[in-house]
Amino acid sequence: MVSSPCTQASSRTCSRILGLSLGTAALFAAGANVALLLPNWDVTYLLRGLLGRHAMLGTGLWGGGLMVLTAAILISLMGWRYGCFSKSGLCRSVLTALLSGGLALLGALICFVTSGVALKDGPFCMFDVSSFNQTQAWKYGYPFKDLHSRNYLYDRSLWNSVCLEPSAAVVWHVSLFSALLCISLLQLLLVVVHVINSLLGLFCSLCEK
């Protein structure tokens, strides 16, 4: 018995939607990471190397961005049966589904972990060292990383009083890394749906033969 056209169409439609959703999320992740490289839209910090290591890693660009976007293109091609996928067999479809799913999973997971660590460590900014060791000096670093007595994420009184430069460094950092965290989480959920859709399509194809 041949596989049902209805089953194949449903699986392909789901792949098209998933590909579009993952691709859109990847573009948003890349955009958020670009913004992290330009605090207050000022390129000076990037040129002077005054950016935190989490932003410089660029996981939103190559992880949640390029890797997920590549997977999204593969998934979309499978859904539209375009090019070499127009008459792809069962083995090729399964291999492509595993490859695209693994690629998107890895990229989204790297971006998710990096964003979580970045939120935990806090922003990279210029702060007054005297408020920590009684020495009058200013330097760039992570003022909230070793501040165990108070959590800056919940104590908003610290947001405008610790970081001297860039202005609104905490708001910029928290907003964009929170966005990256949510985007990568959404990507992970979409990858799970993609894997389930691929397995169901494979199962139905095998059962209906």
UniProtKB/Swiss-Prot annotation:
It comes from the Eukaryota. Keywords: Cell projection, Cytoplasm, Cytoskeleton, Glycoprotein, Lysosome, Membrane, Transmembrane, Transmembrane helix. Residues 38-59, 115-175 are extracellular. GO terms for cellular component: actin cytoskeleton; filopodium; lysosomal membrane; membrane. In adipose tissue, expressed by macrophages. GO terms for biological process: positive regulation of osteoclast differentiation. InterPro entries: L6_membrane. Residues 186-196 are annotated as: Important for homodimerization. One of its GO terms (molecular function) is protein homodimerization activity. The keyword Transport does not apply. The keyword Membrane applies. It is found in: Lysosome membrane; Cytoplasm, Cytoskeleton; Cell projection, Filopodium. It is a multi-pass membrane protein. Induction: Up-regulated by bacterial lipopolysaccharide (LPS) in human umbilical vein endothelial cells (HUVECs). Glycans are attached at N133. Negatively regulates vacuolar (H+)-ATPase (V-ATPase) activity by interacting with members of V-ATPase V0 complex and hence inhibiting V1-V0 complex assembly. Required for multinucleation during osteoclast differentiation. May form homodimers and homooligomers. Interacts with integrins ITGAV and ITGB3. Interacts with components of members of the V0 complex of vacuolar(H+)-ATPase (V-ATPase), including ATP6V0B and ATP6V0D2; this interaction inhibits V1-V0 complex assembly. PANTHER family: TRANSMEMBRANE 4 L6 FAMILY MEMBER 1-RELATED, TRANSMEMBRANE 4 L6 FAMILY MEMBER 19. This is Transmembrane 4 L6 family member 19. It comes from Homo sapiens. The gene is TM4SF19.
